[in-house]
């Protein structure tokens, strides 16, 4: 406990069970001076960090991403802990005290040497990094340099969303924040009633005929390139005579560093019945023939890795690159033989998703009636669809979705909230004006223009735009508006609307950080509705393969979105992570299957009360999942496997390779652990 003039600073309330568990876990890892806490929104990360800060009893610098969050820290200190002297709290770098809460932006105005001087001069010994997932670019670089040169400083890192799915940045992130010491997961918060029970649903769509044609043409061109490679004698010879193949004993370091490429070479030669030494042939026994992802990885290695072994076929590689560029298979150094950017965009913006949104909204309204508070989140505004005319809607975006709903579900009231466009039902304008008045916005600063043929909706403009999100959110809550449509950019981190009970993610976002932030908007506890259960909908466009539909690029994004999210299985009383909570996507489907699955999703979404009960049944058997421990175990296990597979020409216990630091986590994570195809859908294409 920290004492303030002989008075004990203590938390005023009782810690929740998951907070007690986290504090016990943290106690084991304080010695390395890096404490890393990962906790879902609502877990009380701030309280945990303040407990540590007061226990350490030293001058502290707390870094936060926004002014609003800065004020929340001050509020937590003063309201939730006893015996805090307000005079010891500062929010200015120019006047540091014992407890200092500063924005990252304010710190970034100084260079590395100036920051070091500030820290030393003010005897700072603890630094807290709030919302640490923000620290992957310029801020990360600056702080990494500062911390590298300053010793004996404790770093406490807090986040709800580590960049698990971004291998390159995750390594940097862990380098700065340290390995994860304590993790509080969403199910624990539901169990303590800090988050509401919820369920994810997937609604399926199929490509248009034009999209099918576009994909097939692209695949035909990719097959031609693969066949060209398979029959190119200069490339075959270069691989067969590569040092990895003919002189493996003297190239163990390079083989382990490029282990996936080594395996691809073996598979390539094996597919051509080309003999290789029996020792290294044994390494390849368990691997299947070349797949699309193998060709993609190998093409990237050939074109963008400075491997002197392939300099002899430089002209051939130029020809390969030219062919790939011609079909649009290269994007920023990455190679995709199944899709290009244009096709990927077409699928994620599939026009069928507009009708899916209507179906979901109509279904949810029929179940909840006036209690429905549904948010549709999408990527783009598409202002060119703002006119209320009869023009065809063939894109996905805020305005196309708004127009499509108002045309087909006319009884529902909708509002639009983006940085540039605010639209509300005309009959809610008076409520809107009253809310503005309560926020000290004068009438002369508000412009209201009725729009549409029947003037049922009005476009709003405010001179003080900083309050618009707060005001529209309050309007959404207080009025009979059932649906709000907005962009990811605006309805993301920090948007607080606990009354929202349904979310449609009509976005192509796949990253764990962003998608988890958006999901978090819907699963917050509503104090005015203690029985709240939230439904979260994800839209997927499948891909046609012959007469059946299979997972494709759009599905890959949703699969990635689910990878680090624990939730309730669709029909079983158990909590699982990743997309395996659904039982329907482990095989190809016919069109009738798609309709059947969509109907099952709609039917299950109607059982909100049952979903809540099932959550608490599942929680009785729940064991918190610590992703860090899993990652550590995988790394060690796969290190040993690599050595084992490379025997007899290297021993895992040899002095040369005994130091675990010889191999970086990023190498192991990006090669061996994830060596298989990046999606199960790729297994449908073998050449």
Where in the sequence are the language-model features?
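Walker A/P-loop
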Residues: 31-52
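Conserved helix-turn-beta segment of the N-terminal RecA-like "Helicase ATP-binding" lobe
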Residues: 60, 67-93, 174-177
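Long, largely alpha-helical accessory region at the distal end of helicase-like NTP-driven motors
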Residues: 229-275, 552-687
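Conserved RecA-like P-loop NTPase helicase motor core
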Residues: 388-391, 404-578
């Amino acid at each position: 406990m920290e004492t303030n003039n002989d008075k004990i600073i203590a938390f005023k309330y009782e810690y929740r069970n998951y907070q007690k568990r986290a504090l016990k876990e943290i106690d084991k890892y304080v010695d390395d001076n890096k404490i890393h806490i990962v906790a879902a929104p609502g877990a009380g990360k701030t309280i945990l960090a303040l407990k540590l800060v007061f226990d350490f009893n030293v001058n502290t610098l707390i870094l936060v991403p926004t002014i609003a969050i800065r004020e929340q820290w001050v509020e937590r200190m003063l309201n939730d802990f006893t015996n805090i002297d307000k005079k010891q709290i500062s929010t200015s770098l120019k006047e540091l005290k014992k407890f200092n809460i500063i924005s990252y932006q304010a710190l970034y105005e100084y260079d590395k040497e100036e920051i070091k001087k500030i820290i030393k001069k003010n005897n700072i010994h603890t630094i807290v990094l709030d919302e640490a997932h923000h620290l992957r670019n310029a801020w990360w670089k600056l702080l990494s340099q500062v911390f590298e040169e300053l010793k004996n400083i404790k770093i406490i890192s807090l986040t709800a969303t580590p960049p698990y799915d971004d291998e390159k940045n995750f390594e940097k992130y862990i380098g700065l924040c340290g390995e994860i010491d304590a993790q509080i997961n969403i199910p624990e918060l539901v169990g303590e009633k800090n988050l509401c029970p919820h369920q994810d649903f997937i609604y399926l769509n199929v490509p248009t005929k034009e999209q099918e044609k576009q994909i097939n043409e692209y695949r035909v061109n990719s097959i031609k390139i693969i066949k060209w490679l398979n029959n190119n004698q200069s490339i075959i010879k270069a691989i067969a005579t590569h040092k990895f193949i003919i002189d493996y004993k003297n190239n163990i370091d390079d083989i382990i560093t490029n282990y996936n490429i080594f395996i691809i070479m073996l598979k390539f030669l094996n597919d051509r019945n080309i003999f290789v030494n029996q020792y290294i042939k044994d390494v390849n026994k368990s691997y299947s023939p070349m797949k699309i992802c193998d060709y993609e990885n190998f093409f990237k290695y050939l074109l963008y890795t400075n491997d002197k072994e392939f300099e002899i076929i430089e002209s051939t590689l130029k020809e390969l690159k030219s062919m790939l560029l011609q079909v649009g298979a290269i994007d920023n150094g990455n190679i995709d033989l199944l899709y290009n950017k244009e096709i990927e965009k077409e699928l994620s913006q599939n026009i069928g998703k507009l009708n899916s949104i209507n179906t979901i909204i109509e279904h949810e309204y029929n179940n909840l009636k006036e209690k429905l508070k549904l948010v549709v989140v999408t990527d783009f505004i598409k202002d060119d669809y703002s006119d209320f005319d009869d023009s065809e809607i063939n894109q996905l975006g805020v305005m196309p979705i708004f127009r499509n709903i108002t045309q087909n579900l006319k009884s529902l009231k909708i509002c639009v909230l983006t940085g540039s466009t605010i639209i509300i039902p005309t009959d809610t304008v008076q409520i809107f004006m009253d809310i503005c008045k309560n926020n000290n916005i004068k009438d002369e600063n508000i412009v209201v223009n009725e729009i549409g043929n029947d003037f049922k909706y009005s476009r709003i403009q405010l001179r003080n735009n900083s309050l618009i999100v707060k005001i529209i959110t309050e309007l959404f809550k207080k009025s009979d508006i059932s649906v709000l449509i907005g962009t990811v950019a605006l309805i993301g981190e920090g948007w607080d609307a606990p009354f929202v009970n349904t979310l449609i993610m009509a976005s192509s976002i796949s990253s764990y950080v962003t998608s988890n932030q958006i999901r978090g908007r819907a699963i917050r506890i509503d104090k005015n509705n203690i029985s709240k259960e939230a439904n979260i909908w994800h839209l997927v466009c499948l891909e046609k393969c012959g007469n059946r539909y299979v997972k494709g690029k759009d599905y890959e994004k949703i699969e990635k979105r689910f990878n680090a999210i624990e939730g309730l299985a669709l029909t079983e009383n158990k909590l699982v992570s990743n997309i395996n909570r659904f039982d329907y996507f482990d095989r190809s489907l016919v069109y009738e299957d798609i309709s059947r699955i969509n109907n099952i999703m709609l039917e299950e979404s109607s059982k909100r009360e049952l979903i809540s009960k099932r959550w608490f049944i599942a929680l009785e058997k729940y064991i918190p999942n610590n992703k860090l421990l899993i990652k550590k175990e995988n790394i060690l296990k796969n290190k040993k496997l690599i050595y084992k597979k490379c025997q007899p020409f290297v021993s895992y216990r040899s002095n040369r390779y005994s130091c675990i630091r010889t191999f970086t986590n990023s190498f192991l994570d990006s090669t061996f652990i994830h060596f298989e195809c990046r999606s199960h859908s790729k297994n449908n294409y073998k050449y």
